[in-house]
Amino acid sequence: MFTRVANFCRKVLSREESEAEQAVARPHMTIIPREQHAISRKDISENALKVLYRLNKAGYEAYLVGGGVRDLLLGKKPKDFDVTTNATPDQVRKLFRNCRLVGRRFRLAHVMFGPEIIEVATFRGHNEGSESDRTTSQRGQNGMLLRDNIFGSIEEDAQRRDFTINSLYYSVADFTVRDYVGGMQDLQEGVIRLIGNPETRYREDPVRMLRAVRFAAKLNMRISPETAEPIPRLATLLNDIPPARLFEESLKLLQAGNGFETYQQLREYHLFQPLFPTITRYFTENGDSAMERIIAQVLKNTDNRIRNEMRVNPAFLFAAMFWYPLLEMAQKIAQESGLAYYDAFALAMNDVLDEACRSLAIPKRLTTLTRDIWQLQLRMSRRQGKRAWKLMEHPKFRAAFDLLELRAQVENNTELQRLAQWWAEFQASAPPEQKGMLNELDDDPAPRRRRSRPRKRAPRREGTV
């Protein structure tokens, strides 16, 4: 009896504390009329509008929410549009034949229009500790949300979102924007602010720490002090995140057009180590090693390519970032084992990529390309005869040449610079000129294979067959 009373008291007290926290975090709801914001329906995907209109017509609340609203208010073009509603996932599926339900941790409806997917989420609610809540919401021992399918009201949903600037709701019914957490003011002031208690929210989902840094770099905003303070202390929580999810997050961080700024902030908040432990071991106090210079340069180059709408390949990014740890590993294996350098290099590739894949589940299709780029580095100086032409026929030659140029740039190595310049001229030359360049090479001729002489047989003794 005493235990039941104690549990009841704890439940009431925790609920009162939770409600008190919410009251502090939630300002009075602000409705921003059409004439006071920049969102226009012409800038919204037609398919997103179809979803909103059909949900409204069926009697459900429905709003555009998240990054789409944020970007529209900032005058940017959103990459995608998310919808939130009081309709359950099953109710959404009944309204749309082109819908499928996804996710176990967060149950979502994906309404598919060809290549475009409109994500529809039901308003999230708070866990009140009831038996039914325990079956639809689960936490790990470290506070991480393992499952969260408790539905609630729009007010609760606003509190459950991560950052205030992502908790703005656009209504297609009256063209207003609803703000429950002061997100509009933070957006105008350029502040990334977590909703609720930062440490609790980071423990629920440690990836929020990466998102804070990503949004700060992407939107050129600052992270509020209370949102930033716990990050270095809690950075190791990322070790509990599945490597496949961290791989996807790493691409969003480093290959979205703001990679260099994001990289600097990841280092500042101690978030780089859980993603790239191999690389972090080689960081220097001044940040001026060849490895750190090549990482900075490859990220700047990647940002420029994305701004110019050019293709980027994660395999090249990883090849550049892990190049100097690979060299050190190969040298160490060669010295300790007595293997030829080429064999030690092959073993080092395995070791470096195996460790990288333990924190980031880099797909095999990318690690294979990364290996190709690395192996070609050893062949770039061997240009005699037909080797140069054969090398240029390799599918990853261009990427390997780009890495060679990067190495020459960051190492300030005269020999590497001459080699990179030679390859640049060779690629741009006509076949007769290429032949002349090969003839002029001062390099030593390629070593010829020695013919193995037949062994001399011992003279036969008399009487033997």
From Swiss-Prot:
Residues 448-459 have a biased composition (Basic residues). It catalyses: RNA(n) + ATP = RNA(n)-3'-adenine ribonucleotide + diphosphate. Keywords: ATP-binding, mRNA processing, Nucleotide-binding, RNA-binding, Transcription, Transferase. It holds the Pfam family PolyA_pol_arg_C. The active site is at D80, D82, D162. InterPro entries: NT_sf, PolA_pol_head_dom, PolA_pol_I, PolyA_pol_arg_C_dom, PolyA_RNA-bd, tRNA_ntf/polyA_polymerase_I. Its EC number is 2.7.7.19. One of its GO terms (biological process) is polyadenylation-dependent RNA catabolic process. Gene3D superfamilies: Beta Polymerase, domain 2, cca-adding enzyme, domain 2. GO terms for molecular function: ATP binding; poly(A) RNA polymerase activity; RNA binding. Residues 430-465 are annotated as: Disordered. NCBIfam families: pcnB, PRK11623.1. Adds poly(A) tail to the 3' end of many RNAs, which usually targets these RNAs for decay. Plays a significant role in the global control of gene expression, through influencing the rate of transcript degradation, and in the general RNA quality control. Belongs to the tRNA nucleotidyltransferase/poly(A) polymerase family. This is Poly(A) polymerase I. It comes from Salmonella typhi. The gene is pcnB.
